[in-house]
Structures are given as structure tokens and as C-alpha cells.
């Protein structure tokens, strides 16, 4: 009743492209390289959750998720082009040659998937408030892409810490709409796995949100994320994003028998 376990399998597919252009002063033609990888394969996730009832309608939840180390299949292609301009376009590309990756053992490779663990804990008073924290760790320091070996890029173990929750002033209020709104908040500090030019990349974000009651038990969810990523010695980006979502109760999809 208070303990549950679960597992899931995910099929991953997609394509990565890496483009590079070399142009030297005094040389009319530059060299443009295009490397691409088509990724396919399964990843797995195992989770366990403990829900502990407490006094005063409180409950404590503890969650652990494990993403085991794995591998994805990578089919790789690399082509070299000559170009007679300082900017790349279809018109500027000249002769090209496809690299024989099979002879180098790089046409079909394995892309490692690092092991990831997630630990979460939260305290909730149902339909009133929630406060929680989450720690995520990814063992990515040994990650290596043998096909796309970028010289100025290395990897480290990644981790992130986040805190957040929600508050509903009075979920059963019949007088004030604003008291039935779910007010969400959260902060996250993320240490990325990638290192560029020996400089680590970190991300910090602040999240605010509103759960707006609409017909029945459905809600319209509004979210705002404000954050920064990178560092002053490399590339630093300040950003914000807006999100809108709908959570529809199944009563919307039940055909009425009487009008």
C-alpha cells in the first residue's frame, strides 16, 4: 500500500550533426567537413517510491530512480567538401569526398549511456501545500564518442540539486477564485557534464507557475523559467521561457446522456 516499484523501457532515435570549416589566409579554398550520426537503441529506468502517512493529513514521499549504464548504436557518415567562400552555402561548395569510415572501424560504433541516479524527498499536505528536494547524479566523466572526438571538449560527472513546491490558499473556497489557484515555485542548480576549453558549464534557473482551475477538476498551467547558463570566460546566456499546458479531467470526454 505504501511502497511501489516500477520499470520502463525507452526506444531512442535521432540524428547528430557536427560541421567544421577550415579557412586559411592566402588560400582560395577552404575545407568543410560534415559528420553525422544516426542513433538508435533502448534505455531502461527502474524506480521505487515510499509514501509514509503522517499526522494532520501530512504524508512523506521518498523516491529513487536508477537509469543503468548502457549503449546506443551509432551509424556514422563523414564527408569533406571544398569551398571557395568564407561562408558556407550550397552554391559555394565544390568537390566532395565521402570518408571510408568502415576501413577505420568507425562506420558503426557504440555510444555509451552514463549511469544516472535520482533521489527525491517531499512533504505534502494534500490540496494545500508541498515542499520537496531532488538530487540527480550522472557518472559521465568516462563518456567518450570515438567517432566525434572534439579536441577542446571533455566530460565530468554531472549533478543537479533542485528545491520546489506548491501552495494552495484554500482549495475548497467558493468565494475567491484566487484562493483556489495552485502557486508553484522552484530553483535548480545544475552542474553540466560537458567541459569546453577546460571550462565547466553550469546552469541556474528559477521557476514560477500557476495552476488555474477551469471547468470541473481541470486546470490550465502557466509557467515561467528564468535562468543563466555558461560562464563569463566562455559563453554566458541569460534566458527565459514561458509554458502553457492543459490538464483535462476525464469528465470532459464523457458523452452526456441527458441534456
Where are the model-predicted features located?
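Outer-membrane beta-barrel porins/channels
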Residues: 1-259
Amino acid at each position: 500500500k505504501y511502497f511501489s516499484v516500477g520499470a520502463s523501457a525507452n526506444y531512442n532515435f535521432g540524428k547528430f550533426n557536427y560541421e567544421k570549416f577550415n579557412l586559411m589566409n592566402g588560400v582560395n579554398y577552404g575545407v568543410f567537413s560534415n559528420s553525422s550520426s544516426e542513433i538508435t537503441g533502448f534505455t531502461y529506468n527502474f524506480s521505487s517510491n515510499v509514501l509514509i502517512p503522517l499526522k494532520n493529513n501530512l504524508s512523506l514521499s521518498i523516491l529513487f530512480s536508477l537509469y543503468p549504464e548502457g549503449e546506443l548504436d551509432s551509424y556514422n557518415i563523414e564527408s569533406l567538401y571544398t569551398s571557395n567562400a568564407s561562408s558556407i552555402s550550397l552554391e559555394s561548395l565544390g568537390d566532395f569526398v565521402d570518408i571510408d569510415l568502415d576501413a577505420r572501424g568507425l562506420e558503426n560504433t557504440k555510444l555509451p549511456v552514463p549511469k544516472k541516479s535520482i533521489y527525491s524527498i517531499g512533504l505534502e499536505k494534500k490540496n494545500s501545500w508541498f515542499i520537496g528536494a531532488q538530487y540527480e547524479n550522472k557518472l559521465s566523466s568516462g563518456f567518450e564518442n570515438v567517432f566525434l572526438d572534439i579536441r577542446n571538449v571533455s566530460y565530468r560527472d554531472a549533478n543537479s540539486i533542485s528545491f520546489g513546491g506548491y501552495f494552495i490558499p484554500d482549495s475548497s473556497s467558493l468565494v475567491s477564485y484566487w484562493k483556489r489557484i495552485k502557486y508553484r515555485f522552484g530553483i535548480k542548480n545544475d552542474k553540466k557534464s560537458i567541459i569546453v576549453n577546460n571550462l565547466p558549464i553550469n546552469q541556474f534557473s528559477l521557476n514560477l507557475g500557476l495552476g488555474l482551475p477551469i471547468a470541473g477538476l481541470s486546470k490550465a498551467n502557466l509557467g515561467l523559467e528564468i535562468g543563466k547558463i555558461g560562464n563569463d570566460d566562455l559563453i554566458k546566456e541569460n534566458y527565459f521561457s514561458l509554458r502553457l499546458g492543459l490538464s483535462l479531467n476525464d469528465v470532459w470526454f464523457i458523452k452526456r446522456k441527458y441534456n
